[in-house]
A protein has these predicted regions:
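Structural/interface elements that position substrates and couple domains in central-metabolism enzymes
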Residues: 1-120
């Protein structure tokens, strides 16, 4: 598993993580990535993190996506904070797969619920 984020947001135990220093490194080593939902209120509580610098360094933009391979798949756990973890110009790029994820959300939950109830 690789991680590309501000060093102040990394977990204490990084033993099994590959730490990437740039989007280029991410794209060299990945054909699928999962963005994480950034909670602005949590970042603002961390004095060592400048929110504007975080966005400038880590936001997925159209320019960044243009550097990636054509078959890259970008996933997101939702809800998406457009303008924070992904820019408005990148959200409709075909590499962004949140609409596919949404189409599977309810059926996946139904199956999980039935499984827990031993119905399948």
């Amino acid at each position: 598993v690789g991680v590309f984020t501000d060093k102040n947001l990394l977990p204490d135990n990084k033993n099994d993580l590959e730490i990437y220093e740039s989007w280029d490194e991410v794209f060299e080593n990945s054909n699928a990535i999962e963005l994480l939902r950034v909670q602005k209120e949590r970042l603002q509580d961390k004095e060592e993190i400048n929110f504007d610098e975080y966005i400038n360094s880590y936001q997925l933009t159209k320019d960044v996506l243009n550097k990636s391979q054509s078959d890259l798949a970008v996933l997101h756990p939702m809800p998406i904070n457009i303008g924070i973890e992904i820019s408005e110009d990148a959200i409709e790029d075909s590499k962004i797969k949140y609409k596919d994820q949404l189409s599977h959300a309810i059926p996946s939950r139904i199956v999980a619920f039935k499984y827990v109830r031993d119905e399948i």
